[in-house]
């Protein structure tokens, strides 16, 4: 058993050493390749940035006007330092603004452009030549669907009472009761109908002439019954128009209409106004490129 373990350990150690011997050179070569690629990229970037900086300095020199020199109030007291840049002017020539400064605010939007001209109609499409097999539907069964019986439902509520049964047989007559006492006299009956009027009697003998009375006149008699209604009068003139009534409540909003078709796209607007300066960037120190240009 010990021999087997020693042999296994030795074999594993040998394999590990061989793997290290093959892996280390490969890693070394990979690291060197990456190092060379990084150096090449840095060199190319440096060449491009130097070329861009030189072009920017040329544009700055030809476009930007020179600034006025600063007046030092101590020039009359202290001795001025000699200028080492003999080819440069006596004032500060600032370099162009670095791109680290924040840009200005965007300009206002331009006016909408005129609608473009409609495009030419496209060519006629090809006819559809694809054919499809006829669709066949499975026959529909007209048999009733047989569902399995469900479980028994709960007991229903008690029903209403049934109808009354038939009358029973009449019972035997009872014994005659004792005669009752006399009742109270009843109320008088209604008056009978009036009889027919009798025949007119013979006219009486004329009476003696009466004497004119000398008493005061009697009072006015009771007012008579109202007479029949008179004919309807003519229609009166139409009355004036009444004041207008208050405004009624506003009706409910109607349903929204269908959306209209999209309009033609407008032409591109004009260029916006230049934005304001966001911040002031101090002038960087003079570089050797600027000195070499002068």
UniProtKB/Swiss-Prot annotation:
Tissue specificity: Expressed in hypodermal cells.
Gene Ontology cellular component list: collagen trimer
Record family assignment: Belongs to the cuticular collagen family.
GO terms under biological process: larval development
The entry's keywords: Collagen, Cuticle, Disulfide bond, Repeat, Signal
Protein name stated in the entry: Cuticle collagen 10
Span of the signal peptide: 1-30
Subunit structure: Collagen polypeptide chains are complexed within the cuticle by disulfide bonds and other types of covalent cross-links.
Sequence ranges of Low complexity compositional bias: 164-209, 225-265
Function description: Nematode cuticles are composed largely of collagen-like proteins. The cuticle functions both as an exoskeleton and as a barrier to protect the worm from its environment.
Composition bias type Pro residues, residue spans: 100-112
Chain residue ranges for the region called Disordered: 100-133, 149-278
Alphabetized SMART domains for the sequence: Col_cuticle_N (SM01088)
Region (Triple-helical region): 102-127, 153-274
GO MF annotation list: structural constituent of cuticle
Pfam families, per database record: Col_cuticle_N
Keyword Repeat tagged: yes
Claim: Repeat is one of the keywords in the record: yes
Gly residues biased stretches: 210-224
């Amino acid at each position: 058993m010990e021999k087997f373990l020693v042999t296994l350990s030795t074999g594993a150690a040998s394999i590990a050493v061989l793997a290290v011997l093959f892996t280390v050179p490969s890693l070394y070569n990979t690291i060197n390749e990456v190092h060379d690629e990084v150096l090449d990229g840095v060199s190319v970037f440096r060449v491009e940035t130097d070329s861009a900086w030189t072009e920017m300095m040329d544009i700055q020199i030809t476009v930007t006007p020179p600034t006025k020199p600063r007046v030092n109030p101590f020039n009359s007291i202290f001795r001025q330092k000699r200028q080492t840049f003999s080819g440069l002017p006596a004032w500060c020539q600032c370099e162009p603004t670095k791109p680290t400064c924040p840009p200005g605010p965007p300009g206002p939007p331009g006016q909408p452009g005129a609608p473009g001209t409609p495009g030419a109609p496209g060519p006629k499409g090809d006819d559809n030549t694809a054919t499809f097999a006829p669709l066949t539907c499975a026959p529909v069964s007209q048999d009733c669907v047989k569902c399995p019986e469900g479980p028994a439902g709960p007991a229903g509520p008690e029903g209403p009472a049934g109808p009354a049964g038939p009358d029973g047989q009449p019972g035997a007559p009872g014994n005659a009761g004792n005669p009752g006492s006399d009742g109270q006299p009843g109320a008088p009956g209604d008056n009978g109908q009036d009889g027919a009027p009798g025949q007119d009697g013979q006219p009486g003998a004329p009476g003696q002439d009466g004497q004119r009375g000398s008493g005061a006149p009697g009072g006015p008699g009771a007012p008579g019954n109202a007479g029949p209604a008179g004919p309807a009068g003519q229609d009166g003139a139409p009355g004036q128009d009444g004041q207008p009534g208050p405004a009624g409540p506003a009706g409910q909003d109607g349903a929204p209409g269908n959306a209209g078709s999209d309009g033609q796209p407008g032409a591109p607007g004009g260029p916006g106004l230049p934005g304001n300066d966001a911040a002031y960037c101090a002038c960087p120190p003079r570089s050797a490129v600027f000195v070499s240009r002068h």
